[in-house]
Each structure stands twice: as C-alpha cells, then as structure tokens.
Amino acid sequence: MRMGFYYSLEDWRFPHQLPHLPMWEDKSVYQPMVEQAHAQVRELMTNYGKVDILWYDGSFPSGIWRSEELNAMVRSLQPEIIINDRSGLPEDFGTPEQHISPQDRPWEACMTMNDTWGYTAGDKNYKSVRQILGMLIQCASQGGNLLLNVGPDAEGRIPEPAVERLRVVGEWMRTNGKAIYGATRTPLVTHSFASSTRVGDRMYLLSAHWPGSTASFGWCGNRVLSAKLLATGERLIVEQKGDRVWLRGMPQYAPDPNVSVIEITVEGEPKWPEVRFT
C-alpha cells in the first residue's frame, strides 16, 4: 500500500494566522509558523520510510511558505514523491475543491459527502448514492481522481448516513470497478445516455439514464468487436455501420438502479476523432 501525508501549512494554534488579522504584512509575525512547517515536513520526510504523496493544505502565496525551498528539501529526501498544488506552486497535480474542473495534467477533485469538511452534527445534507457515483464517473471520464471527504464524529466514528452510502458505492465498485480503476478519458462526449471511460482496448459506457432496449453512438475509429453488460456478462448485439454503432438486445429497464455499465471491446488500441453521442 502506498503511503502519503496530509499536511496543513497553516496551524490554528497560532492565533495571529487568522486571515482577518494583518499578519502577512510583518514577516516576523508569521515566520515562527513557517519555520515550524519546514521542520515538521522534514520530520515527516525523514522518519517514516518511503513517502509517496505529500498533500499540502493552505491558501497563501508560495513566498510566504518559502515553498521552492521547502519542496526542494522534500524532493531531496523523497525523490519519487508527488506533491499537490497547495503550497502556492503548481507541482505535480491539481486539486480543485468542491467543483470538478478537468485540467491538462493529473488532477483530483476534492469533494465532501455533505456540505462540510469536518464533522458537523447539524449538517444532514448528504449527497445521494447516485450523486456520489456521478462525481466518481465525472472525474474518471475526464481523466481525474475523486477525493471524497468523510468527517468522523468526536468519537472517531463515521456517521451512519455516510456509512450507508459508502456501502452501496462499494458494492457498485465491486461489480463495476473495471470501468473506473486505471481508467482514462475517451473522445466520446457525455450526453443523456452515458459517460465513457477507457481501459486498454475496452471502453465503458456508464449510464445513469438507461435508454431502453436499443442505443447508438457515433464512432469513426476501430472495428467494434463486442459489447456486454459488465455486471452480468450478458452479450449485446453490435451493429457497426459507417460512423455509427448500434447496440441492440439491451434490457428494457436499467440493470442497476443507479448506474449501469456496458463494456465495449474494439480491435486494437482505440483510435478515433472526437465524436458526439446523438
């Protein structure tokens, strides 16, 4: 198992770090917190074996934290590490928060299960299973990762509404994980029928709005060899004519109440221009 650290550059034990106070105008005021950050990050990079990810949190400019110096030290101690973009420098991957915004480099969307990051007893606005799967699929289909936050209560317990939803998502992943793990984006544009991901010579159509017994999509690339329901292995009839592929013999009703997945195998590595479902 790979190991990483979350590290908050800001430390709330320093009362002068609160953003409504003008601490950043006087270097002598915030310097103790910066020195602490450098010392603690060095300790994390030195005392715990191989570290794969350093996930900073914080929102102030890189000059405040002396981030170039800090990250150079990190990479000297952990040459294979990857670092996120929250020290004020782009580094290795982006971390859009509370929105899913694809980037032209590795990225992961940081999303909450309800409306808060920590535990808030009064926050009952939990996302549904369908919403969570939708976020997961949106990230995977656009080449990103989903970082889903769960806030434990004061006793360290995961709130039951989160547990209930995560169990259902976990069951879905056990059945359909092939469409998510290691997936990359495809040129197929999301529409009302399905989103799509690609793994090797297989493409996956992930449908939250099942079209019934027949569906089609535009395709100008490799020959389509086969199609099946991922959950059951049931084969579908494939008809490829010109720039369209028709899928027939599908169940009239969605096999999964949340998101159903079709696995499509093509001849060789998928290569095609960008197309759009119609």
Write out the residue ranges for each language-model feature.
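Mature catalytic domains of secreted/periplasmic carbohydrate-active enzymes
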Residues: M1-T278
